[in-house]
């Protein structure tokens, strides 16, 4: 498929995608984001600067960060790279919305005490990867979900290690309906 045909390019498209993701998360996981979230469409350079990284473009497609969830006091925002394919943008939104949900529902100090500071990122990122990949399966986007699952399983970072840990407790449902529990159901002990 030609990625540019499905690219999300306008603020209006991003807002619609956010609304779709919010409805899906409520339908699939029974969760709602109950605060206003500012959605910003940014270029890759600005997105990476917000992460404290430098963006170095390459001539070929590369796996890179497409979004970030930001909490500043009681304000929440999601920055998304513009021009990404629709399904990639949707999965990134679900990932970042999972972080917003975590900010709103988890006692971060209790999570750190329970799992240790060294596992904190695995707890957060593992759940967000689980959520985005499971969402793609539930949407019937099996090829995209399977690709993301395989790539994430072999990653040797907090995303991959965390995702594999979540799979142990919350196996993927490969159909278009959930067949078991989700990490959204246990706010004190998600893993």
Can you annotate each of these PLM segments?
Residues 1-64:
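A metal-dependent hydrolase signature that marks the N-terminal structural subdomain at the beginning
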Residues 25, 91-105, 125, 129:
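Active-site recognition of the HExxH zinc-binding catalytic motif
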Residues 100, 104, 134-138, 172:
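Active-site catalytic microenvironments for nucleophilic, acid-base chemistry
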Residues 138-191:
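Long, well-structured alpha-helical subdomains associated
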Residues 113-154:
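Post-HExxH zinc-binding segment in Zn-dependent metallohydrolases
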Residues 7-13, 79-83, 115-117:
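Second-shell loop/turn segments in exported
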Residues 73-93, 119-120:
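Short pre-active-site segment immediately N-terminal to the catalytic Zn-binding motif
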């Amino acid at each position: 498929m030609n990625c540019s045909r499905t690219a999300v390019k306008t603020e209006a498209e991003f807002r619609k995608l956010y609304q779709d993701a919010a409805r899906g998360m409520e339908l699939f996981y029974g969760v709602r984001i109950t605060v206003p979230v500012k959605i910003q469409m940014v270029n890759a350079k600005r997105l990476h600067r917000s992460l404290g990284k430098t963006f170095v473009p390459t001539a070929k497609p590369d796996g890179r960060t497409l979004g970030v969830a930001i909490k500043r006091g009681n304000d929440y925002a999601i920055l998304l790279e513009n021009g990404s394919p629709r399904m990639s943008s949707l999965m990134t939104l679900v990932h970042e919305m999972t972080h917003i949900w975590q900010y709103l529902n988890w006692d971060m100090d209790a999570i750190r005490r329970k799992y240790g500071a060294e596992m904190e990122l695995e707890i957060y990122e593992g759940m967000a990867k689980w959520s985005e990949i499971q969402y793609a399966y539930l949407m019937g986007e099996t090829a995209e979900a399977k690709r993301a699952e395989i790539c994430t399983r072999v990653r040797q970072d907090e995303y991959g290690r965390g995702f594999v840990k979540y799979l142990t407790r919350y196996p993927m449902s490969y159909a278009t309906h959930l067949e078991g529990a989700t990490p959204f159901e246990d706010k004190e002990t998600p893993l």
